[in-house]
Amino acid sequence: CCLFVVSVFLLVVGAVWHLPEIVTVSNNVYGKELPIQSVETEEKKAVLTFECAWDHSSIKDILEILEDHNVRAAFFVTGDWVKQYPEDVRRIVQGGHDIGNHSATHRNMVQLEKEEIEKELKETHQAVKELTGKEMKFFRPPYGAFNDTVILTAKEGGYLTVMGNIDSMDWKDYGAKTILRTVMEDKELQGGSIIRLNSEAKYTKEALPKLIESLEREGFRLVTLSQLLYQEAYHLDVKGRQIPDDR
Protein backbone atom coordinates (compact mmCIF):
# COMPACT_ATOMS: atom_id res chain seq x y z
CA CYS A 1 0.00 0.00 0.00
CA CYS A 2 2.73 2.43 0.99
CA LEU A 3 4.71 1.58 -2.13
CA PHE A 4 1.64 2.32 -4.26
CA VAL A 5 1.10 5.69 -2.58
CA VAL A 6 4.73 6.66 -3.07
CA SER A 7 4.60 5.62 -6.72
CA VAL A 8 1.49 7.72 -7.34
CA PHE A 9 3.08 10.69 -5.59
CA LEU A 10 6.17 10.47 -7.77
CA LEU A 11 4.04 10.28 -10.89
CA VAL A 12 2.13 13.40 -9.87
CA VAL A 13 5.29 15.32 -9.08
CA GLY A 14 6.81 14.22 -12.37
CA ALA A 15 3.78 15.51 -14.23
CA VAL A 16 4.20 18.93 -12.65
CA TRP A 17 7.83 19.50 -13.55
CA HIS A 18 9.10 18.95 -17.06
CA LEU A 19 12.64 18.30 -18.19
CA PRO A 20 14.34 19.56 -21.34
CA GLU A 21 14.70 16.96 -24.08
CA ILE A 22 18.17 18.15 -25.08
CA VAL A 23 20.55 20.34 -23.12
CA THR A 24 23.08 21.70 -25.59
CA VAL A 25 23.04 25.35 -24.64
CA SER A 26 25.12 27.79 -22.63
CA ASN A 27 23.74 30.81 -20.81
CA ASN A 28 27.00 31.21 -18.90
CA VAL A 29 29.04 34.27 -19.81
CA TYR A 30 32.32 34.79 -17.93
CA GLY A 31 31.09 32.58 -15.10
CA LYS A 32 27.69 34.24 -14.72
CA GLU A 33 24.32 32.91 -15.87
CA LEU A 34 22.37 35.35 -18.04
CA PRO A 35 18.79 35.46 -19.33
CA ILE A 36 18.09 35.75 -23.04
CA GLN A 37 17.67 39.43 -23.92
CA SER A 38 17.55 39.30 -27.74
CA VAL A 39 18.33 36.96 -30.62
CA GLU A 40 20.84 37.06 -33.47
CA THR A 41 18.73 36.67 -36.59
CA GLU A 42 19.20 37.33 -40.28
CA GLU A 43 15.58 38.39 -40.70
CA LYS A 44 14.27 41.59 -39.09
CA LYS A 45 11.99 39.94 -36.53
CA ALA A 46 10.86 41.12 -33.09
CA VAL A 47 8.57 39.90 -30.32
CA LEU A 48 6.02 41.77 -28.22
CA THR A 49 5.88 40.29 -24.71
CA PHE A 50 3.32 41.12 -22.05
CA GLU A 51 3.52 40.48 -18.30
CA CYS A 52 0.26 39.55 -16.57
CA ALA A 53 0.39 39.62 -12.78
CA TRP A 54 -2.39 41.70 -11.29
CA ASP A 55 -5.24 43.24 -13.27
CA HIS A 56 -7.02 41.88 -16.36
CA SER A 57 -9.16 44.85 -17.41
CA SER A 58 -7.12 45.51 -20.58
CA ILE A 59 -6.33 41.97 -21.68
CA LYS A 60 -9.43 41.55 -23.85
CA ASP A 61 -8.66 44.77 -25.74
CA ILE A 62 -5.00 43.83 -26.12
CA LEU A 63 -5.90 40.45 -27.59
CA GLU A 64 -8.39 42.07 -29.97
CA ILE A 65 -5.79 44.62 -31.14
CA LEU A 66 -3.28 41.85 -31.79
CA GLU A 67 -5.89 39.85 -33.70
CA ASP A 68 -6.92 42.88 -35.77
CA HIS A 69 -3.28 43.37 -36.79
CA ASN A 70 -2.70 39.64 -37.31
CA VAL A 71 0.10 39.67 -34.74
CA ARG A 72 1.01 36.91 -32.31
CA ALA A 73 2.84 37.75 -29.10
CA ALA A 74 3.95 36.20 -25.80
CA PHE A 75 2.24 36.53 -22.42
CA PHE A 76 4.01 35.78 -19.13
CA VAL A 77 1.46 34.90 -16.46
CA THR A 78 1.64 34.35 -12.72
CA GLY A 79 -0.10 31.43 -11.06
CA ASP A 80 -2.34 33.81 -9.13
CA TRP A 81 -3.40 35.48 -12.39
CA VAL A 82 -4.14 32.10 -13.95
CA LYS A 83 -6.39 31.17 -11.04
CA GLN A 84 -8.23 34.49 -11.11
CA TYR A 85 -8.68 34.78 -14.87
CA PRO A 86 -8.76 31.30 -16.42
CA GLU A 87 -10.85 32.42 -19.40
CA ASP A 88 -8.24 35.02 -20.32
CA VAL A 89 -5.55 32.34 -20.19
CA ARG A 90 -7.60 30.21 -22.56
CA ARG A 91 -8.06 33.18 -24.91
CA ILE A 92 -4.31 33.77 -25.00
CA VAL A 93 -3.61 30.18 -25.99
CA GLN A 94 -6.54 29.97 -28.41
CA GLY A 95 -5.28 33.14 -30.10
CA GLY A 96 -2.04 31.40 -31.05
CA HIS A 97 0.12 33.34 -28.60
CA ASP A 98 2.96 31.94 -26.52
CA ILE A 99 2.30 31.66 -22.81
CA GLY A 100 5.17 31.80 -20.33
CA ASN A 101 5.79 31.36 -16.63
CA HIS A 102 6.05 34.52 -14.50
CA SER A 103 6.17 32.68 -11.13
CA ALA A 104 3.22 31.80 -8.92
CA THR A 105 2.98 34.82 -6.62
CA HIS A 106 5.23 37.46 -8.24
CA ARG A 107 7.86 37.28 -5.52
CA ASN A 108 11.45 38.40 -5.99
CA MET A 109 13.13 35.13 -6.99
CA VAL A 110 16.57 36.31 -5.86
CA GLN A 111 15.34 36.40 -2.28
CA LEU A 112 14.12 32.78 -2.36
CA GLU A 113 15.81 29.46 -1.73
CA LYS A 114 16.12 27.01 -4.61
CA GLU A 115 13.23 24.88 -3.31
CA GLU A 116 10.98 27.94 -3.14
CA ILE A 117 11.87 28.93 -6.70
CA GLU A 118 11.00 25.42 -7.86
CA LYS A 119 7.66 25.61 -6.06
CA GLU A 120 6.83 28.97 -7.67
CA LEU A 121 7.58 27.61 -11.13
CA LYS A 122 5.89 24.24 -10.64
CA GLU A 123 2.62 25.68 -9.37
CA THR A 124 2.18 27.95 -12.37
CA HIS A 125 3.37 25.30 -14.81
CA GLN A 126 0.82 22.82 -13.54
CA ALA A 127 -2.02 25.38 -13.42
CA VAL A 128 -1.50 26.34 -17.07
CA LYS A 129 -1.07 22.73 -18.16
CA GLU A 130 -4.30 21.64 -16.48
CA LEU A 131 -6.17 24.59 -17.97
CA THR A 132 -4.83 24.55 -21.53
CA GLY A 133 -2.78 21.39 -22.00
CA LYS A 134 0.26 23.56 -22.77
CA GLU A 135 3.75 22.78 -21.46
CA MET A 136 5.31 26.19 -20.93
CA LYS A 137 8.99 26.57 -21.82
CA PHE A 138 9.72 30.27 -21.26
CA PHE A 139 10.23 31.94 -17.87
CA ARG A 140 10.48 35.61 -16.95
CA PRO A 141 11.38 36.37 -13.32
CA PRO A 142 9.31 39.07 -11.61
CA TYR A 143 10.89 42.53 -11.34
CA GLY A 144 13.62 41.40 -13.73
CA ALA A 145 15.46 40.02 -10.69
CA PHE A 146 17.68 37.02 -11.34
CA ASN A 147 20.90 35.32 -10.31
CA ASP A 148 22.64 32.06 -11.16
CA THR A 149 20.35 30.03 -8.89
CA VAL A 150 17.19 31.44 -10.48
CA ILE A 151 18.32 30.77 -14.06
CA LEU A 152 19.78 27.33 -13.36
CA THR A 153 16.71 26.22 -11.39
CA ALA A 154 14.48 27.29 -14.27
CA LYS A 155 16.76 25.48 -16.71
CA GLU A 156 16.51 22.27 -14.67
CA GLY A 157 12.75 22.50 -15.14
CA GLY A 158 13.08 22.83 -18.91
CA TYR A 159 12.73 26.61 -19.04
CA LEU A 160 14.60 29.25 -21.00
CA THR A 161 14.81 32.44 -18.93
CA VAL A 162 13.80 35.34 -21.17
CA MET A 163 13.91 39.04 -20.31
CA GLY A 164 14.08 41.51 -23.22
CA ASN A 165 16.45 44.14 -24.58
CA ILE A 166 13.71 46.76 -25.08
CA ASP A 167 11.74 47.94 -22.05
CA SER A 168 8.71 50.07 -22.97
CA MET A 169 8.64 51.48 -19.43
CA ASP A 170 4.85 51.51 -19.79
CA TRP A 171 4.48 50.85 -16.07
CA LYS A 172 5.55 54.46 -15.42
CA ASP A 173 2.19 55.62 -16.87
CA TYR A 174 3.66 58.58 -18.77
CA GLY A 175 1.26 58.15 -21.68
CA ALA A 176 0.86 56.30 -24.98
CA LYS A 177 3.15 58.65 -26.93
CA THR A 178 5.93 58.12 -24.41
CA ILE A 179 5.62 54.34 -24.71
CA LEU A 180 5.84 54.58 -28.48
CA ARG A 181 8.82 56.92 -28.37
CA THR A 182 10.63 54.84 -25.72
CA VAL A 183 10.48 51.71 -27.86
CA MET A 184 11.03 53.19 -31.31
CA GLU A 185 13.93 55.45 -30.29
CA ASP A 186 15.79 52.81 -28.28
CA LYS A 187 19.23 52.34 -29.84
CA GLU A 188 19.04 48.61 -29.07
CA LEU A 189 15.97 48.13 -31.29
CA GLN A 190 17.08 45.74 -34.03
CA GLY A 191 16.30 42.39 -35.61
CA GLY A 192 15.81 39.85 -32.83
CA SER A 193 14.59 42.37 -30.25
CA ILE A 194 12.34 41.25 -27.42
CA ILE A 195 10.05 44.07 -26.30
CA ARG A 196 8.68 44.19 -22.76
CA LEU A 197 5.17 45.45 -22.03
CA ASN A 198 2.74 45.14 -19.12
CA SER A 199 -0.82 44.10 -19.86
CA GLU A 200 -2.20 46.05 -16.92
CA ALA A 201 -0.30 49.32 -17.45
CA LYS A 202 -2.58 52.32 -17.91
CA TYR A 203 -1.65 53.35 -21.46
CA THR A 204 -0.40 50.10 -23.02
CA LYS A 205 -3.54 49.20 -24.96
CA GLU A 206 -3.78 52.78 -26.27
CA ALA A 207 -0.17 52.69 -27.49
CA LEU A 208 -0.31 49.17 -28.93
CA PRO A 209 -1.89 49.81 -32.37
CA LYS A 210 0.57 52.58 -33.24
CA LEU A 211 3.45 50.57 -31.83
CA ILE A 212 2.62 47.61 -34.07
CA GLU A 213 2.18 49.86 -37.09
CA SER A 214 5.43 51.73 -36.40
CA LEU A 215 7.43 48.53 -36.01
CA GLU A 216 6.01 47.06 -39.20
CA ARG A 217 6.66 50.32 -41.04
CA GLU A 218 10.31 49.98 -40.02
CA GLY A 219 10.39 46.52 -41.58
CA PHE A 220 9.94 44.37 -38.49
CA ARG A 221 7.97 41.15 -38.67
CA LEU A 222 6.34 40.51 -35.31
CA VAL A 223 6.52 36.86 -34.28
CA THR A 224 6.22 34.69 -31.16
CA LEU A 225 9.09 33.68 -28.91
CA SER A 226 8.74 30.11 -30.21
CA GLN A 227 9.38 31.42 -33.71
CA LEU A 228 12.32 33.62 -32.70
CA LEU A 229 14.34 31.79 -30.07
CA TYR A 230 16.81 28.98 -30.66
CA GLN A 231 15.85 26.02 -28.47
CA GLU A 232 19.27 24.33 -28.61
CA ALA A 233 22.86 24.68 -29.85
CA TYR A 234 23.34 28.34 -28.95
CA HIS A 235 25.34 30.60 -26.67
CA LEU A 236 24.88 34.12 -25.29
CA ASP A 237 27.11 37.15 -25.65
CA VAL A 238 27.74 39.59 -22.80
CA LYS A 239 24.47 41.43 -23.55
CA GLY A 240 22.41 38.26 -23.38
CA ARG A 241 22.01 38.08 -27.15
CA GLN A 242 21.28 34.51 -28.25
CA ILE A 243 23.64 33.36 -31.00
CA PRO A 244 23.53 29.96 -32.76
CA ASP A 245 26.70 27.92 -32.31
CA ASP A 246 27.30 27.66 -36.05
CA ARG A 247 27.95 31.42 -36.30
What are these regions (language model features)?
Residues F50-C52, V77-T78, S103-A104, R140-G144, ...:
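Active-site-proximal beta-strand/loop segments in catalytic clefts of secreted hydrolases
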Residues L19-I22, Y30-E42, D68-N70, K83, ...:
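C-terminal domain-boundary segment and adjacent tail
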Residues H56-S58, R107-E135, A145-G191, Y203-A207:
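Alpha-helical scaffold elements lining the catalytic groove of polysaccharide deacetylases
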Residues D61-I62, E87-R91, V150-T153, A207-L211:
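A short acidic, amphipathic alpha-helical/loop segment
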Residues E21-L112, E116-A127, T132, M136, ...:
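Active-site beta->alpha N-cap acidic-glycine motif
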Residues C2-W17:
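Hydrophobic membrane-insertion alpha-helices, especially the h-region
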